[in-house]
Amino acid sequence: MSKEIKFSSDARSAMVRGVDILADTVKVTLGPKGRNVVLEKSFGSPLITNDGVTIAKEIELEDHFENMGAKLVSEVASKTNDIAGDGTTTATVLTQAIVREGIKNVTAGANPIGIRRGIETAVAAAVEALKNNAIPVANKEAIAQVAAVSSRSEKVGEYISEAMEKVGKDGVITIEESRGMETELEVVEGMQFDRGYLSQYMVTDSEKMVADLENPYILITDKKISNIQEILPLLESILQSNRPLLIIADDVDGEALPTLVLNKIRGTFNVVAVKAPGFGDRRKAMLEDIAILTGGTVITEDLGLELKDATIEALGQAARVTVDKDSTVIVEGAGNPEAISHRVAVIKSQIETTTSEFDREKLQERLAKLSGGVAVIKVGAATETELKEMKLRIEDALNATRAAVEEGIVAGGGTALANVIPAVATLELTGDEATGRNIVLRALEEPVRQIAHNAGFEGSIVIDRLKNAELGIGFNAATGEWVNMIDQGIIDPVKVSRSALQNAASVASLILTTEAVVANKPEPVAPAPAMDPSMMGGMM
């Protein structure tokens, strides 16, 4: 395929047009009075959303050069979403502001490399000032405020706050679709995995079809149990203790399963067998997690252990285990707290180093199960369109809340970025680096301007007053009042503001230093084939 190439100002101008098209589409959603954007879907009903990254990902421009500019801004939104989970619209607005001011100076003859160094220095100073202004999120009320601001719903804020209180900041909080119209919170305490009993005859409650085991022993193995003789010595020891048994194995089949079921029905002992969770290496890791949580040992050939040699000391223990046809929940495992803490630290380290989004998600789930439980927010709505929009808002709120717990909060509504302007202005830079600093100074005002504009106010007047206001005092665009943003619960996580600024500056600098752009040349559309006269038949 042949290529089309543009150089210097022609290349940058085309990319900037793409940046502006995408940013102008996204920035209308910013703030408490931001509007929605309707996205056409290839099938199903249109998606109505105010989620910046969702909108950015949908935009494809016909002009290849403009599309490259749009895609670079979309990358800013995506990266900010990956790191902080929110702030994608702010990142887009900042990118457009830096590019717009930067292009003016580059076109006027400034050196783009010098400008880039100035931008990097200014952003580093702004980030440091943001961190210095941070307030730790230490209580349930503060968490609820962060979530409420992001989701634009106090009720959602309460759900997320309650969920984090129940499962901890490392716990898994999932968002599912409810069958009804109401949004509700469901918390599963302890370690849960998606494997149910191997036989319905193992239930202890025939009405609910669940098996409840109080103070059970837990046999954990990656082997398949087909011969009852392999575990007979162990069963005899458990029988003497008069305690129930949970078997977690690769499988239980052959004569072993009917023998266990028969003894359960006769009342000889209370036993439930389930398959081990996961597959391959992930299964081994999850079995090890269960063993550490319950204080047991995984009976595996990798450690040179055989089922026939296993003793009661190798079994795990828990206060309670509940098993239904689809899942198993282990509550209050008897594992060593230090061993559990060490395992948690190892998994956290793996989360930080992995490059796979799928692996990171699975590691987060394992971390949550070791840390205390899983909370499920079941989203209800009247229509499918409303449901999709609600789910996106709650996901943003959840991500923002986690970011707030991690690095603290600052005043919201763009106020925090405006508050760091003095720290950037004091940087002593010269030449093109000073120009780069001034570009960042102008960009830091842009989120406040856009929020005010979307709410029907004049952004320049708001920013002028904000520059002279005390730290934390800002403009509440929802009411048109000047308030203490923190006291009013108008807050942003530091991680969100920081990531938005850093990612915007990074990509904007790349655009400013671009000197040539190479794009695929559109293929000419082939003319339609001429109709064969013989096909005309009686039409002649």
From Swiss-Prot:
Swiss-Prot/TrEMBL catalytic activity: ATP + H2O + a folded polypeptide = ADP + phosphate + an unfolded polypeptide
Gene Ontology molecular function, alphabetical: ATP binding; ATP-dependent protein folding chaperone; isomerase activity; unfolded protein binding
GO biological process: chaperone cofactor-dependent protein refolding; protein refolding; response to heat
Keyword Signal: no
Segments crossing the lipid bilayer: none
EC number: 5.6.1.7
Pfam families, per the entry: Cpn60_TCP1
Binding-site list for ATP: 29-32, 86-90, 413, 476-478, 492
Keyword annotations of the record: ATP-binding, Chaperone, Cytoplasm, Isomerase, Nucleotide-binding
HAMAP family per UniProt: CH60
NCBIfam families per the UniProt record, alphabetical: GroEL, PRK00013.1, PRK12849.1, PRK12850.1, PRK12851.1
Family note: Belongs to the chaperonin (HSP60) family.
Subunit text: Forms a cylinder of 14 subunits composed of two heptameric rings stacked back-to-back. Interacts with the co-chaperonin GroES.
Protein's name according to its UniProt entry: Chaperonin GroEL
Lineage, top ranks: Bacteria, Bacillati, Bacillota, Bacilli, Lactobacillales
